[in-house]
């Protein structure tokens, strides 16, 4: 069997590695560089350029040079962050027929996985040239905070590139693997702070020796899938554009050629300011007007850059705080801090991390190469070449389904070790309901609508039965790639339906922030919503049982009683439609009060009818303690596609 290579598919740069003689080796590309720019260009003659060659011609071909496409992978066109990106990139981002964000180059619309596949092909070829044999299998890394659809899209990119993706692993976990393999034995806890070109992740990882085996266990992970070096570049570009506008009155944002030159200059200046205190951005002939050519010349100090990006650096600290809290660990208990991603070379970032964790980060881990090296080690583990490593990763976000009252019922909590499988029994909301819709959600909020919808599917042909009687077993199964498989089964008939969740979209910046904003901010709102949902469910159940009781009682109920009960039922139904919990509680009490005499009358009659001596108990209405009422839409046959 051939080697399983490790690929770090980055937003800005990508890297490929392979395990040789027990050590992960980063492979140099055809240009002699250890990393390859994640840039793809479509030349006029139809040639596809990847990496440095694409970057070199970007200024003369801005519309057909695609960069930072990873930020669009698994995302919807209408998302705010995508709309923001549209204004900042010289190439065209378009809306696909399914609502996804695609890109346009050379008059062709293409999906982000197609573009990423070109980078993966280059990585594959780099490895093949070095190894002298075909490469068909790879481990590809993704940001730890990538959601299900983004992981699926990355796997698709691998398939398009002709690679069998043996495993998708999280970037911080891969970096910890590269760091921990050659360290002294013994248990220690590390933080991996990964600020790359387009994404930010932080993971708390425990490295332990268990029966002579290196065990890497992720305790918690957090992050932001739309925060990275590209955002730092954009701040600098905005500043340069504003300075030029003040001086010349011309807006360079409308000039794709100038924008491409600015991007290159901003990236270069940012890198220079990591070691120098100031730098000059000098772009002659940046544009022209009727009076002749215009030149841009701006001096930037490190302090100015730091002022421009201060809030971006601050934004990375809150996920660190949440990850520590989720892991149940104090910052003082962290043994080592590992910095990954090129943006962590910025002194301001290093200082912010050192201040928060109370210790300097290690300098012996290459931030550009550690992730690919870790992926290569995982590839060797899967191939059986490395036998003393066990990797225990986690699911970054809570997964569940929508249940009665618009509540999200969690099946798999965030930071659960994967692979994992969890089942729970639900039931129907209406009598004789013939089908249920399973609505799968990902996120941290109690209100279903506040979470990310991953998909829906139907389980039909449920035999007629009173509500609450059918037992529908829903099973969530997350594989080692962090990809979700969902199944539903009617326990009475054995009829089952299952899907691999293939959502069309990824998480927007706002959605991610909404989901992971911790309990402190949303606890009160979530608690109120849960209480309101519970009150509504109680009201619905009382309406249903009261109407059934009145129907069963027949002429034993007087006309006055019937009128009073019906009025109370109508009042409760109206209250349940509102958002006032106190009003619902009051109407529940009112209905209970007016229906109590009828209930007592029915109970007395039942007692009288029972045979004397060892009276048998009337069989209660079917009820299962482990059944959670779930709100499902009945799928009408004439609506089926």
Curated annotation (Swiss-Prot):
The modification Phosphothreonine is found at residue 199. The keyword Ribonucleoprotein does not apply. PROSITE patterns: HSP70_1 (PS00297), HSP70_2 (PS00329), HSP70_3 (PS01036). GO terms for molecular function: ATP binding; ATP-dependent protein folding chaperone; unfolded protein binding. Residues 602-641 are annotated as: Disordered. It holds the Pfam family HSP70. Keywords: ATP-binding, Chaperone, Nucleotide-binding, Phosphoprotein, Stress response. Induction: By stress conditions e.g. heat shock. Residues 604-619 have a biased composition (Low complexity). Acts as a chaperone. Belongs to the heat shock protein 70 family. This is Chaperone protein DnaK.
């Amino acid at each position: 069997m051939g080697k399983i290579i490790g690929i770090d598919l980055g937003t800005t740069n990508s890297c490929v590695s392979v395990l040789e003689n027990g050590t992960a080796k980063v492979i140099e590309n055809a240009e002699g560089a250890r990393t390859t720019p994640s840039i793809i260009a479509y030349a006029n003659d139809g040639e596809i350029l990847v990496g440095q060659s694409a970057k070199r011609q970007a200024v003369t071909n801005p519309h057909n040079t695609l960069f930072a496409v990873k930020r669009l992978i698994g995302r919807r066109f209408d998302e705010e962050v995508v709309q923001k990106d549209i204004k900042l990139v010289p190439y065209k981002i378009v809306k696909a027929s399914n609502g996804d964000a695609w890109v346009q180059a050379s008059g062709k619309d293409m999906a982000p996985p197609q573009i990423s596949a070109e980078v993966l092909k280059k990585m594959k070829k780099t490895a093949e040239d070095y190894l002298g044999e075909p490469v068909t299998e790879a481990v590809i890394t993704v940001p730890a905070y990538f959601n299900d659809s983004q992981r699926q899209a990355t796997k698709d990119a691998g398939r398009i590139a002709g690679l069998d993706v043996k495993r998708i692993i999280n970037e911080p976990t891969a970096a910890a693997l590269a760091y921990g393999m050659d360290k002294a034995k013994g248990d220690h806890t590390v933080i991996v702070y990964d600020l790359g070109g387009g994404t930010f992740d932080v993971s708390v990882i425990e490295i332990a020796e268990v029966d002579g085996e290196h065990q890497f266990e992720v305790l918690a992970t957090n992050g932001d899938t739309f925060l990275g070096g590209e955002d730092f570049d954009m701040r600098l570009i905005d500043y340069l554009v504003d300075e030029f506008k003040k001086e010349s009155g011309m807006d360079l944002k409308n000039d794709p050629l100038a924008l491409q030159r600015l991007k290159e200059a901003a990236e270069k200046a940012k890198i220079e300011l990591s070691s120098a205190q100031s730098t000059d951005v000098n772009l002659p002939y940046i544009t022209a007007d009727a009076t002749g050519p215009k030149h841009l010349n701006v001096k930037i100090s490190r302090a100015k850059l730091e002022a421009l990006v201060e809030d971006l650096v601050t934004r990375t600290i809150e996920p660190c705080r949440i990850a520590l809290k989720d892991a149940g660990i104090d910052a003082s208990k962290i043994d080592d801090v590992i910095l990954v991603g090129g943006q962590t070379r910025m002194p301001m970032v290093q200082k912010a991390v050192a201040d928060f964790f109370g210790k300097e980060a290690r300098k012996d881990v290459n931030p550009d190469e550690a992730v690919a090296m870790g992926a290569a080690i995982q590839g060797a583990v899967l191939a059986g070449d490395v036998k003393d490593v066990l990797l225990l990763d986690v699911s970054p976000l809570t997964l569940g389904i929508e249940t009665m009252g618009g509540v999200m019922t969690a099946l798999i909590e965030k930071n659960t070790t994967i692979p994992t499988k969890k089942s729970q029994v639900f039931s129907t909301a209406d009598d004789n309901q013939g089908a249920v819709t399973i609505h799968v959600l990902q996120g941290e909020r109690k209100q279903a609508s506040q979470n990310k919808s991953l998909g829906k599917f139907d389980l039909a042909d449920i035999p007629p039965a009173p509500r609450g009687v059918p037992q529908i077993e829903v099973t969530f199964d997350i594989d080692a790639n962090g990809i979700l498989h969902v199944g539903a089964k009617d326990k009475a008939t054995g009829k089952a339906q299952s899907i691999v969740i293939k959502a069309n979209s990824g998480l927007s910046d706002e959605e991610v922030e909404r989901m992971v904003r911790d309990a402190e901010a949303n606890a009160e709102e979530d608690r109120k919503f849960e209480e309101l949902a519970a009150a509504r469910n109680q009201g619905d159940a009382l309406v249903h049982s009261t109407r059934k009781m009145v129907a069963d009682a027949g002429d034993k109920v007087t006309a006055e009683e019937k009128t009073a009960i019906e009025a109370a039922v109508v009042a409760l139904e109206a209250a349940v439609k509102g958002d006032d919990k106190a009003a619902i509680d009051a109407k529940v009490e009112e209905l209970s009060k007016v229906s109590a005499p009828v209930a007592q009358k029915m109970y007395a009659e039942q007692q009288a009818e029972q045979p004397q001596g060892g009276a048998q108990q009337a069989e209660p209405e079917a009820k299962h303690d482990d059944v959670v009422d779930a709100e499902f839409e009945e799928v009408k046959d004439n609506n089926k596609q």
